[in-house]
């Protein structure tokens, strides 16, 4: 876990965790399922416990997990997917692995295919034929909605696993009578209607950069605290809707827990201020990570795919 706000401390108790200054590190070396308790503590007022959650951490042997399997994987998302930075690293992680994957989709190039569309929110995929200069490959003109069966008929692409990572752009827009979770549920129902055996991962949209330096770069004049709250409400809704659905082949992909929001976002070097030439690093994009951040997304995708039971 990275980038805790300054007023709280996230700590844990268990047999495999290492408490560092800026994060908790899970450092198990032996395959198994480990019990762990996460605690959020207020550092300013007598250290009260604000929240606590018991979790199970499953660790698999990378050398043998899903050995011999070959699966087609589709990433469906917004600009985080469309920029095509984490997909090459996913392929790299599976190079020489006992499990092989093939990334599929109508966008991207070479082996780094996907279904990412910059600027898109969940309702764009469900209800829009095109948006932001990009066509919706899943849009059925007859029903005017997302239709996975139509997509397969048109594209001939049939994945074994679909990982949906959407919600960030929903923060900036209001949807008439729907929420991000409602729209993702619509997409999931359509996919499962085509083939209930397709595994679906719902990736929690990544949090914004810890620094407020870039809050004026996008959505100027919007309070960064308000944006941060909205960005956190979306994964909360996703968790409420899709948790504990593993028996239905629906899984949460906790990408959000593996992003270093303090150190792995894009920065520039500039003067401290107009009268001080001391050089400082400032975040220039609060939404899109730097390459190390995308590589952390790839790490999460790799771990999810290696842990899947087919």
Can you name each region flagged by the protein language model?
Residues 111-146, 213-222, 244, 253, ...:
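Surface-exposed intrinsically disordered loops and tails
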Residues 56-90:
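An acidic-aromatic substrate-binding cleft motif
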Residues 273-310:
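Histidine-centered active-site loop/cap adjacent to the catalytic His
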Residues 208-258, 287, 291-298:
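Substrate-gating cap/lid alpha-helix
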Residues 74, 82-178:
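Conserved SGNH/GDSL esterase-like catalytic core that processes O-acyl groups on lipids
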Residues 69-72, 97-102, 157-163, 168, ...:
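Loop/turn elements at helix/coil->beta-strand transitions in domains of secreted/extracellular proteins
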Residues 1-66:
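Beta-strand-enriched, solvent-exposed domains that form extended recognition/catalytic surfaces
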Residues 76-80, 104-109, 164-169, 191, ...:
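Active-site-proximal beta-strand/loop segments in catalytic clefts of secreted hydrolases
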């Amino acid at each position: 876990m990275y980038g805790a706000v300054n007023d709280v401390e996230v700590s844990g108790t268990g047999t495999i965790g290492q408490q560092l200054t800026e994060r908790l590190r899970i450092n198990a070396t032996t395959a198994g399922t480990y019990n762990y308790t996460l605690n959020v503590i207020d550092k300013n007022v007598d250290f009260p416990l604000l929240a606590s959650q018991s979790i199970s951490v499953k660790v698999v042997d990378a050398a043998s997990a899903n050995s011999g399997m070959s699966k087609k994987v589709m990433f469906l998302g917004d600009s985080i997917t469309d920029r095509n930075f984490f997909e090459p690293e996913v392929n790299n992680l599976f190079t020489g692995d006992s499990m092989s994957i093939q990334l599929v989709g109508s966008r991207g190039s070479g082996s780094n295919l996907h279904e990412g569309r910059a600027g898109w929110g969940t309702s764009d995929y469900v209800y829009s034929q095109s948006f932001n200069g990009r066509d919706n490959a899943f849009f059925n003109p007859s029903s005017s909605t997302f239709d996975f069966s139509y997509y397969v008929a048109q594209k001939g692409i049939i994945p074994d696993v679909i990982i949906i990572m959407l919600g960030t752009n929903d923060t900036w827009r209001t949807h008439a009578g729907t929420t991000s979770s409602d729209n993702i549920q619509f997409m999931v129902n359509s996919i499962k209607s085509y083939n209930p055996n397709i595994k679906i991962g719902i990736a929690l949209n990544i949090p914004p950069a810890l620094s407020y330096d870039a809050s004026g770069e996008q959505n100027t004049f919007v309070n960064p605290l308000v944006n941060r709250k909205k960005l956190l409400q979306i994964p909360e809704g996703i968790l409420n809707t899709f948790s504990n659905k593993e028996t239905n082949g629906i899984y949460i992909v906790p990408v959000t827990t593996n992003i270093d929001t303090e150190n792995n976002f894009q920065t520039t070097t500039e003067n401290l201020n107009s009268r001080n030439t001391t050089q400082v690093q400032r975040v220039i994009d609060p939404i899109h990570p730097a390459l190390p951040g995308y590589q952390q997304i790839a790490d999460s995708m790799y771990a999810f795919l290696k842990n899947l039971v087919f």
